[in-house]
Amino acid sequence: MRFPFFASFIVFCIWLGYEIHKHRNKQAKVDQEFWQTEAAANNTRRKSLDDLEYIKIPFDSLPMNLLKEDSEIADYHHTLIELSNSPIVNFTGISNTDLKLQYGAPNIELLSRYDQSYTTLVRTLQDWAEVLFEKGYTNEACSILEF
């Protein structure tokens, strides 16, 4: 009775050791590929940013005159006006490594600022639409969110 249990335990330990070893090898390969790609990205020269899809804020299609005396909405307007003076690009879903490979490592700070501007734009539009919705301006809130 003890021998089958002991033998099963030994087989289980050997199998577990094999699986752990296999997982470590697989993870080491993934890590190595990541660092090779990262090294290649860090050595990429600066490339042109002309093909980026810059976002322009369409002030004429946004309800800029609605409740503009409200201080909270005035803050959103001010943020949007400031954002309109800076480049805005949506890099959602694109890793920094991919950005460095495509546009060059020296551009990563600039591209990060463009993406941060996009994040600020989206957050501001969401907050502005929420305030309008709460005040009963459903259609105007929808037009903001549809942008």
Show the residue positions of the predicted features.
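N-terminal alpha-helical interaction modules that lie
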Residues: 2-122
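Residues at structural and domain junctions
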Residues: 114, 127-128
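Generic helix N-cap/helix-start motif at coil->alpha-helix transitions
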Residues: 119-126, 138-139
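Residue at a conserved register position within TPR or TPR-like alpha-solenoid repeats
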Residues: 131-132
